[in-house]
Structures are given as C-alpha cells and as structure tokens.
Amino acid sequence: MKVHKGDTVLVIAGKDKGAKGKVIAAYPERSRVLVEGVNRIKKHTPQSANERGASSGGIVTQEAPIHVSNVMVIDSDGQPTRIGYRVDEETGKKVRISRRNGKDI
C-alpha cells in the first residue's frame, strides 16, 4: 500500500471530500487508512466504572477507517499527487516519489 502512517492526505471522494488530515494508522490487509478528523462516527459503548469510580461509556465520537482509493497523498509542494517508487542508488532501497514532480516523499 502506498499510503503510510504519518502521511498528510486529501480526501478525494465520499462525505468528507476535500478534507485534509494526517494518517493515524494504516491497515494494508484491508486497504484502509485512519485519517485524523475524517469519517467521524458515533459509537455507542456500554457504561462501565473503572477502579477510581469514574464512569466511562455512552456515545463516543471517533474516526473510522476509509478506503485508500478515496485519499491522495499531499506532496512537499502542498498538492495532491499519486505515488511512485524508485530504487535509491546509494542504499539500494525502494523510496516513494511524487508522480507530479518526481521528488522524494
């Protein structure tokens, strides 16, 4: 998967189209990413008391994962771009590059 944790992405489809956010977590086996502040849902959790007596639960708002095809990575110029790969000559490792301008991400 070409989108990694820590990337800044732009949502290009869905109810949050146009929103920017940072990737909190990536789930490559499901092809989904968790983006900060995007696709917020209300989750109903049961009331429970912890050891100090404070209760937790009720309706909690949190982010839900969205499909990786609905986001584009923002490059160093602040523009959305597709991702490509190239092999670094010095280290021999694969590095991600911006398809828009060819710079490393």
Curated annotation (Swiss-Prot):
GO biological process, one term: translation
Keywords: Ribonucleoprotein, Ribosomal protein, RNA-binding, rRNA-binding
One GO cellular component term: ribonucleoprotein complex
InterPro entries named in the record: KOW, Rib_uL2_dom2, Ribosomal_uL24, Ribosomal_uL24_CS, Ribosomal_uL24_KOW, Translation_prot_SH3-like_sf
Region (Disordered): 40-61
GO MF annotations in UniProt: rRNA binding; structural constituent of ribosome
UniProt KW Ribonucleoprotein keyword: yes
Quaternary context: Part of the 50S ribosomal subunit.
Family per similarity comment: Belongs to the universal ribosomal protein uL24 family.
Cited function: One of two assembly initiator proteins, it binds directly to the 5'-end of the 23S rRNA, where it nucleates assembly of the 50S subunit.
Protein name, UniProt field: Large ribosomal subunit protein uL24
UniProt organism field: Mycobacteroides abscessus (strain ATCC 19977 / DSM 44196 / CCUG 20993 / CIP 104536 / JCM 13569 / NCTC 13031 / TMC 1543 / L948)
